[in-house]
Swiss-Prot record:
Alphabetical list of SUPFAM superfamilies matching this protein: Homeodomain-like (SSF46689)
Motif (Antp-type hexapeptide): 120-125
Keywords assigned: Developmental protein, DNA-binding, Homeobox, Nucleus, Transcription, Transcription regulation
Gene3D superfamilies listed in its UniProt record: Homeodomain-like
Family from the record: Belongs to the Antp homeobox family. Deformed subfamily.
One term of GO molecular function: RNA polymerase II cis-regulatory region sequence-specific DNA binding
Official protein name in the record: Homeobox protein Hox-B4
Listed PROSITE patterns: ANTENNAPEDIA, HOMEOBOX_1, HOMEOBOX_2
Chain segments carrying region Disordered: 28-117, 210-232
BP GO terms, sorted: anterior/posterior pattern specification; embryonic skeletal system morphogenesis; positive regulation of transcription by RNA polymerase II
Length: 232
């Protein structure tokens, strides 16, 4: 009677143990650990070394992937989960390989992917060098011609009409007004003077003339002078 009254009065709860099916998992069964020990001892005690095959790299990557999958599968044990909760979590765990393994397989499958930029060598580039510049030494580029505007040409023509030779002061003023350099003004006037002499058929002053020829033209030939004296 005392025992029955004690059981009735106390808040005793019957312990609930997990079903026997959960204990039959491979991680808890002694046969699983025994098989692992036998495999490890067989691998260490192998009298003959492994033969190196052509697929050694692929087998190594496959074993590394398998090892990473096993480590990810054993993570719930380290977190201290109840075996019953582990049984619910394991079916939902993904079986895909880690990203490192997938990257290795993609590299072996597609070594030349179209996403990589093509390599451009110097001899593949276009060389924008004209034929005239090829004669210059050290790759010196030819000076480009100055493109004068219509307003600039008109002002220069006016100045040339009044004065064919410019002073330094006037050249600076025109260059400042037309937004040109002094060298450009100087070259334009030189070219314009050459054109003007050619149009008027004037001799080029840069060519040295023979003084004896000039004297004969100015005074006439000596035979003509003798004839004139005889006639007188």
């Amino acid at each position: 009677m005392r025992m029955s009254s004690f059981l009735i009065s106390s808040n005793y709860v019957d312990p609930k143990f997990p079903p026997c099916e959960e204990y039959s998992h491979s991680d808890y069964s002694p046969g699983y650990y025994g098989s692992q020990k036998r495999e490890s001892s067989f691998q260490h005690g192998a009298p003959y070394p492994r033969s190196v095959s052509s697929n050694s790299s692929s087998s190594a990557s496959y074993s590394s992937c398998q090892g990473s999958v096993r480590q990810s599968a054993r993570l719930p044990h380290s977190s201290g989960l109840v075996p019953g909760e582990k049984a619910h979590l394991e079916p939902h765990m993904p079986t895909s390989s880690p990203p490192s393994c997938s990257l290795k397989s993609s590299e072996h499958k597609h070594p030349d992917s179209p996403e990589q930029d093509p390599v451009v060598y110097p001899w593949m580039k276009k060389a924008h060098i004209s034929k005239a510049t090829s004669t210059y030494s050290d790759g010196e580029a030819k000076r480009s011609r100055t493109a004068y505007t219509r307003q600039q040409v008109l002002e220069l023509e006016k100045e040339f009409h009044y004065n064919r030779y410019l002073t330094r002061r006037r050249r600076v003023e025109i260059a400042h007004t037309l937004r040109l350099s002094e060298r450009q003004i100087k070259i334009w006037f030189q070219n314009r003077r050459m054109k003007w002499k050619k149009d008027h058929k004037l001799p080029n002053t840069k060519i040295k003339s023979n003084p004896s020829v000039n004297l004969q033209i100015a005074g006439g030939s000596p035979n003509q002078n003798k004839g004139n004296h005889v006639c007188q």
